Amino acid sequence: MDCRPMNEEGRKILDRLRRLCSRREYCRKDVMKKALDALDGDAAAAQEVVDVLVDEKYVDDLRYASAYARDKAGLSGWGEVKIRHMLAAKGVAREIISEALGQIDSSKAQLRLEKLIENKYRSLKDDPQCRLKLLRFALGRGYGYDEVARVVDFLMKYD
């Protein structure tokens, strides 16, 4: 499958990275870092290894971003803002991030936010800065200010 000239060390590293990428998703930037580390900083050889992995579909930023967004939203309870920021830090393109975030069920995310704030509210009920602390907590989880403020205000008004 690989018709490019590559030395023995490059082929070994390529095989190792194929095994890694077949076990879980990696973004292009993470694979490039692993290749650079293994090749002692040889950027040209590392780029060649990454290009082969992308051509062979071992590395796909959209697939990585979709899995990352799904896991962080579903398992970690992160909001769209935090997921977007973390994927951008991984070097994933904006269009790919938007497409991956579009796959998240917004109604489930809203329910998760409500439950998250409701649970935190129970521990802060008597605190004079309850609203501020709830806002800060939910914003830190990566939810947008408007949706957080709406849920917090509703909860405090009807409690």
Annotate the PLM regions.
Residues 1-159:
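An alpha-helical, amphipathic repeat domain used for nucleic-acid recognition
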